Amino acid sequence: MTAGETRVAPPRQGPSPWSVRATLSTTVAVLGVAALLHFVRYTLLIVNRSVLLNPIVAGAATWLAVLASVAALFSVIGCAYVLTDWLIARRAAAFEHRHQPDPRPGWALRAGCLVPIVNLAWAPVFVLELALAEDRPARLRREIWTWWGLFIASTAVSVFATATSFTTDAQGIADNTVSFIVAYLLAMATVVAAAQLVFAVERAPVERPAHRWVVVAEEPAPQHEPEQKPEKAPETPAEVEREGQEPAA
């Protein structure tokens, strides 16, 4: 590269920051709506024990909850794909900045992030490796552990809610509805924690990693000695007498 040339940064790969934010916000909204509709359904189930509900109202509440569950499922899957693409692109940029290739191939990253149950162990490992590559494990520790804990809890409750969704008695349906409410709330909290983790990582660009500033004592200013005026030569008495002349009386 010659002196007159400027280095052009490589184009950003993976999803844009705007698309990541939009996906996370949409997923949180869909999960919140799903939790709300299941809460409405649970309320109607309680009311139906003492008051006979209109079949149209009962059917609408049931099908709206089902549609919300389907929308939440697709939203979570789409969010997982976008976050996986973001992680792969961020890791590639971080290791390229260190002049090293990513030690894990793309297929391994996708499998570890997208395969259910497997991603509980491997997805956080991939994020920890990213934090180490950017020399920021301590700064991101709280966000990583918060997201990881919520991820495990959300998966466990979701599996339990799905496994108990085939019950047919009234009490079992009510209990399963509560399980889904908790599952959606935990999933929403997990996505919020993932968003906070992404924002924390994006806060420091790869091209400008975080620095640790060290306070250095300021050197004392040099003291200038006052300028000394040159000594004035002693004045000699004016010559009033000339040779060959007597002094005046």
Q: Could you tell me what each predicted segment is?
A:
Residues 4-19, 129-136:
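Cytosolic juxtamembrane amphipathic/interface segments immediately preceding
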Residues 12-32, 140-147:
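Alpha-helical transmembrane segments and their helix-start/interface "positive-inside/aromatic belt" motifs
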Residues 24-41, 69, 73-89, 119, ...:
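Helical transmembrane-bundle signal
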Residues 36-70, 158-184:
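Membrane interfacial helix motifs at helix-loop boundaries and amphipathic/re-entrant anchors
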Residues 85-107, 216-222:
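Cytoplasmic juxtamembrane regions at transmembrane-helix boundaries
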Residues 105-127:
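Hydrophobic, aromatic-rich membrane-embedded alpha-helical segments
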Residues 125-153:
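Membrane-interface alpha-helices
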Residues 206-236:
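Short, highly charged, low-complexity non-transmembrane loops/tails of multi-pass membrane proteins
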